């Protein structure tokens, strides 16, 4: 009966949900919940990266918040605590070539599906930052035929600990990756701009053009 309720069910809401810190009560059942978020959506270069985190009910992590509001040093400290504390965590990555092929919205949703499907523990409920549900096709691509319930929450990364945690591990993973890519493409200063469209980054694009990891369909890249 419980599995029948969950199978292929997707729910999208655009307002705050009646949730406890780490779980949502649905039909009087306490569901194992994963928070999902993505980072790098607005970048001109590099992948979009998503995080998925299942936190325990018995342990809280002080300082969880939207990764954009936390200093870089603090993010890495929190990421370490998340890795140590989480029941399970996952990272999903979609690279620029595919971003250009399917568009950044679809790539962001696919990255979140990827992050969810690599969790070692199957989540019964996904709490997703934003206002979109993840299409079934992406879960199927990563081998899931049994789908969790989904709730999308606007600004969930600022209010839901599991989503905040997902945001933090995605951000630190991506920042570390961009610093590594800086060694391959040092002329673009990815270790500093992380692929975002800073003034200096745009000036570099104007002078030497894009690298193989730039998003060719993005206006900030193709306009140069």
Curated annotation (Swiss-Prot):
One of its GO terms (biological process) is mismatch repair. It catalyses: Endonucleolytic cleavage to 5'-phosphomonoester. Its EC number is 3.1.26.4. Disulfide bonds: none annotated. One of its GO terms (cellular component) is cytoplasm. The keyword Transmembrane does not apply. The keyword Repeat does not apply. CDD domains: RNase_HII_bacteria_HII_like. Keywords: Cytoplasm, Endonuclease, Hydrolase, Manganese, Metal-binding, Nuclease. It is found in: Cytoplasm. PANTHER family: RIBONUCLEASE H2 SUBUNIT A, RIBONUCLEASE HII. This is Ribonuclease HII. The lineage of its organism: Bacteria, Pseudomonadati, Thermodesulfobacteriota, Desulfovibrionia, Desulfovibrionales.
């Amino acid at each position: 009966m419980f599995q029948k309720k969950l199978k292929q069910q997707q729910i999208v809401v655009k307002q705050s949900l009646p949730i406890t810190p780490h779980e949502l009560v649905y039909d009087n059942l306490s569901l194992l919940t994963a928070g999902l978020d993505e980072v790098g959506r607005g970048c001109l270069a590099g992948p979009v990266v998503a995080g998925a985190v299942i936190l325990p009910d018995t342990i809280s992590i002080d300082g969880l918040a939207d990764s954009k509001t936390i200093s870089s040093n603090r993010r890495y400290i929190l990421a370490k605590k998340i890795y140590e504390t989480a029941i399970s965590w996952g990272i999903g990555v979609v690279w620029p070539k595919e971003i250009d092929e399917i568009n950044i919205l679809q790539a962001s949703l696919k990255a979140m599906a990827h992050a969810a499907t690599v969790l070692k523990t199957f989540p019964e409920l996904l709490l997703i930052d934003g206002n979109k549900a993840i299409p079934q096709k992406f879960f199927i691509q990563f081998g899931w035929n049994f789908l969790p319930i989904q709730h999308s929450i606007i600004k969930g990364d600022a209010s839901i600990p599991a989503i905040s945690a997902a945001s933090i591990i995605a951000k630190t993973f991506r920042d570390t990756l961009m610093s590594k890519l800086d060694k391959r493409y040092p002329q673009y200063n990815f270790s500093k701009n992380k692929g975002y469209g800073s003034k200096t980054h745009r000036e570099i694009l104007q002078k030497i053009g894009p690298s193989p990891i730039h998003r060719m369909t993005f206006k900030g890249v193709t306009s140069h």
